[in-house]
Amino acid sequence: MLKPGITLYFVRHGETDWNAVRRYQGQTDTPLNDTGRAQAARNGQALRRILDGTSANFDFVASPLLRTADTMRIIRREMGLDPDAFAREDLLKEINFGHWEGQIWDDLPNSDPDEFAARKADPYRWRPRNGESYEDLSKRVGNWIASLERDTVAVSHGGVSRVVRGHILGVDWGEIHALDVPQDKVLRLRRGEQAWL
């Protein structure tokens, strides 16, 4: 749960070529594509309007992976801020998909049917070989949420967005895997409520 009075603006990184074909990225470092750079610019313009000169009152933090750090750089540039003046936080890295990283989602029912069925049966607790479950991720991200002391703009990943909403909004853990994770919107979380901007 966010400490009282704190607002979190959460942005998922812009699209990558792997996103475009539904390939699991996890903690594999992949660059933004042209669509992703445009999405990041749109989100930066939105935050510039929303924060309207109050950005000095916010902490800026991103996952250290390439696609998130580059998204934050573009956002900050669009806001008229130093593109590199933000913190990198390992707790905000995407869920580690283990042996599924690099695999295309639509291929998994045929290429790994047993694991695909196990994930479908318990998407919150299922853990890929050499990877993390959503339960593991929720513990990691919960530690980050508890550490927030100021209003914050964060750039991270789809899985992280889901567990952030689980913690802050009380979304049922068994349902978080199905939450929408757009790359062209800013999510505002405050006072236990969300708004897509």
Named regions from a protein language model:
Residues 6, 15-81, 132:
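Active-site-proximal alpha-helix that buttresses catalytic centers in soluble enzyme cores
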Residues 142-150, 189:
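Alpha-helix C-terminal capping segments
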Residues 171-197:
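Domain-level recognition of soluble alpha/beta enzyme cores
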